[in-house]
């Protein structure tokens, strides 16, 4: 998915639909963080867009891509209004919680390519 001329976000489509409540519960279970949920218009969620960390500014790109829901780490005031106006759900799952898997994966990739080692130190952060 293209966010401001950079291929940073992702869009996925699932066969069956889920509800925003079900998705929020699944994310809370996997990320160990209670998401902030803007439920949109309650439509079944089939097309999901996501970008980890502080990607709330990409919500409009997710809407333009036809997403039923956008998942990211943070939320700002404009996203609340956009969710109400468009009916697209928005879940802010925590900046740290949504990025704690990417950093070790990237480090492992670099280590494999360069023959070095790394140690990831996961310091919990409520943000």
Language-model features, listed with the residues they occupy:
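Hydrophobic structural segments
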Residues: 1-127
């Amino acid at each position: 998915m293209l966010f401001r001329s950079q291929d940073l976000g992702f869009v996925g489509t699932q066969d069956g639909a889920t509800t925003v409540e079900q998705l929020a519960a699944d994310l809370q279970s996997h990320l160990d963080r209670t998401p902030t949920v803007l439920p949109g218009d309650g439509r079944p969620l089939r097309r999901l867009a996501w970008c980890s960390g502080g990607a709330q500014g990409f919500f409009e790109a997710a809407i333009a891509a036809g997403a039923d829901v956008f998942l990211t780490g943070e939320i700002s005031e404009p996203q609340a209004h956009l969710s109400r106006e468009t009916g697209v759900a928005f879940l802010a799952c925590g900046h740290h919680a949504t990025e704690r898997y990417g950093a070790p994966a990237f480090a492992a990739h670099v280590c494999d390519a360069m023959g070095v080692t790394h140690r990831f130190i996961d310091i919990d952060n409520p943000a």
